[in-house]
C-alpha cells in the first residue's frame, strides 16, 4: 500500500491525528484531509481522489469489519484478469440478497470463487477498483441530489462494466445502527434500511419523471 488517504468531514480531526500517530511511520504513509467546513461525502471523495497517483484505489468507509487478510492482492489479480470489472467487492452472497446477483458462482484463475452483481455494478462499499475506470466518470460532486450508486451503476453498465464479489467474504457491515441521517432512535434494522433505500429509489424515479432532477 503506497498511501492511506483519510478524509474527515466533521470536527474530529484532532482525534484522528492522535490515532494516526500510533501507526504513522510503521511502513505506512498517511494523508489526513480534515475539512474546515462540512462539505458532504461527495466533495470529500473528490478531495481524496485528487490525491491518488496509483493505478488502483481501495475505497472504504469506517463502518466495516474486516474478517481476513489478502483481499487487496486477490482483488488485484482478478481486475488484471478481466478489464471490464469495475469493482471487486468483498461482501457475501447473503449480504447482497436485496439486489440482483448471479445464481452461479465462478472461479477466477487465482482459485477464488466469486459471483456477479447484475445491476449495481458500482458501489462505495469496500472494494478495489482501477483509477482509470474511476476517472471515466470524473467528479462525484455532480451526483448531488441523485441516487449516487444508481447513477454510477447506470454509467458503468452502459459502458460494459460489471462488478463481482467474493463467495468467501472479507468484510461485514457494522454501521447500520449508527447511520446518522436515517433514524434519530438509533434502532435501525437491516429491513429498515432496505425499505429506506426502496423509498428513496421510488422518490427519485418520480422526481426524474417530472423533470425535477436530471
PLM feature segments, named:
Residues 55-65:
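Short beta-strand-to-loop acidic/aromatic patch adjacent to the donor-nucleotide binding site
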Residues 36-51:
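Glycine-rich, basic loop-to-helix element that forms the pyrophosphate-binding segment
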Residues 88-101:
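Short beta-strand-to-loop element that shapes/binds the nucleotide-sugar donor at the catalytic cleft/hinge
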Residues 121, 126-129, 136-214:
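C-terminal catalytic/acceptor-binding lobe
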Residues 1-33:
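Acidic donor-binding segment of Leloir-type glycosyltransferases
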Residues 15, 44-45, 68-72:
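Acidic donor-diphosphate engagement hotspot in glycosyltransferases and nucleotidyltransferases
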Residues 95, 110-129:
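A recurrent flexible, glycine/aromatic-enriched loop bordering the glycosyltransferase active site
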